[in-house]
């Protein structure tokens, strides 16, 4: 696990980080609200990256060239203010979570209902047991994990532990590996039969509508 020194947490404003998020079709207003900008040193060199805080005070760390974490590693559990929510949506990583919020904002800009439910972000499928512990109090749980073996295993583990309350929503983007690919219009290799590479495109209104949930 990388060692980070001289950590400084700032508001997310660096042009390179915002450009990276824009290229992933992430709504920048949402990104600024949900993430921070981290400046740190590693092996004597200075770096900056997007930070996404977990429930134990650690961070998921991401920029165009690096994906890692600052310990302690844990899930992120986002609870809305006010009355307890009965529903919770589960995502594999921060980019999936940001993609979902961006899709909802695009489809329902005047009333996206982003605070109608709580959210759990695994930050790693190895954290699925921690997620299950956090999900016990919810009546309705929607899993929007990756369409790969690790994502399916994590979804199955949640379904096995929590039963009828769990809905696997990955079929809504079944031709895509994950929610960010869905947002960007990049189909998974299993569903693409053309030889030429597929370009990232801005999603159509119909694509966003599928995740009205």
Residue map of PLM features:
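Phosphate-handling DNA/RNA-contact segment within nucleic-acid enzymes
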Residues: 40-134
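TOPRIM metal-binding catalytic domain and adjacent DNA-binding surface shared by DnaG-type primases
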Residues: 1-47, 194-213
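TOPRIM fold recognition
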Residues: 86, 104-213
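Terminal peptide-recognition signature
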Residues: 21, 92, 100, 143, ...
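Alpha-helical elements of the RecA-like P-loop NTPase motor core of helicases
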Residues: 19, 98, 156
């Amino acid at each position: 696990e990388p060692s980070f020194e001289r950590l400084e947490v700032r508001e997310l404003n660096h042009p390179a980080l915002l450009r990276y998020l824009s290229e992933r079709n992430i709504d920048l207003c949402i990104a600024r609200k949900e993430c921070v900008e981290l400046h740190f040193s590693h092996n004597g060199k200075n770096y900056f990256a997007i930070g996404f805080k977990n429930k134990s005070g650690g961070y998921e760390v991401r920029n165009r060239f690096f994906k890692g974490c600052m310990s302690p590693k844990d899930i992120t559990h986002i609870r809305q203010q006010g009355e307890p929510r009965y529903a919770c949506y589960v995502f594999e990583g921060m980019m999936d979570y940001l993609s979902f919020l961006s899709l909802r904002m695009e489809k329902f800009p005047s009333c996206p209902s982003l605070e109608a439910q709580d959210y759990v972000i695994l930050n790693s499928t190895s954290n699925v047991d921690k997620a299950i512990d956090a999900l016990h109090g919810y009546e309705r749980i929607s899993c929007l994990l990756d369409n790969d073996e690790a994502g399916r295993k994590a979804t199955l583990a949640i379904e096995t532990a929590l039963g009828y309350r769990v809905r696997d929503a990955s079929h809504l983007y079944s031709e895509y590996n994950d929610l960010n690919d869905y947002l960007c219009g990049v189909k998974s290799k299993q569903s693409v039969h053309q030889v030429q590479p597929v370009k990232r495109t801005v999603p159509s209104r119909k694509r966003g509508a599928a995740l009205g949930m």
